[in-house]
Amino acid sequence: IMGAGGIGFDVAEYLTQSGPSTSLDPQAWAAEWGVDTAYRQAGGLTEPQEEPSARKVFLLQRKDSKVGAGLGRTTGWIHRTVLKNRGVVFIAGAVYERIDDAGLHVRVGEGSTVLPVDTIVLATGQEPMRDLYAVLDESGADVRLIGGADVAAELDAKRAIKQGTEVAVSI
């Protein structure tokens, strides 16, 4: 998976889970996280039942920072832990060189490697699309640009909701 933002992490979780998400089944969730719901163990904790993925997944980002550093402060560690437990390989500072029959060629630091992949998922960000806005604005229509159409980098739902609310109140 090229791109380790929120969408890249969500796709990695989806691709590495077997069956329905454990978040839909309280007993499966408790087992995955080592929660002893019967309190047979001290502190109500037991050994987590990790389920490695049947797929080999690489999660790459171009930034040198910690993979997933831009995820939510209160949930980022959860997403990183789930993927780590499923055997996902995190690669930061990746320079994408090419894709061929051998796989994805990347350079990390001074070394180059080929990741032997048969499928590549692009979660590499988005570009704002302002074409319609420009046409409507030039025509004199009362239009506003908000959310990802305004700033697509690191989409921020709170910012988009705030902007949408402000526009709605002003109408």
Model-inferred region functions:
Residues 126-144, 149-155:
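FAD-binding beta-loop-beta segment adjacent to the flavin cofactor pocket
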Residues 12-27, 59, 139-146, 158-171:
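Internal hydrophobic alpha-helix adjacent to the cofactor/substrate pocket in enzyme cavities
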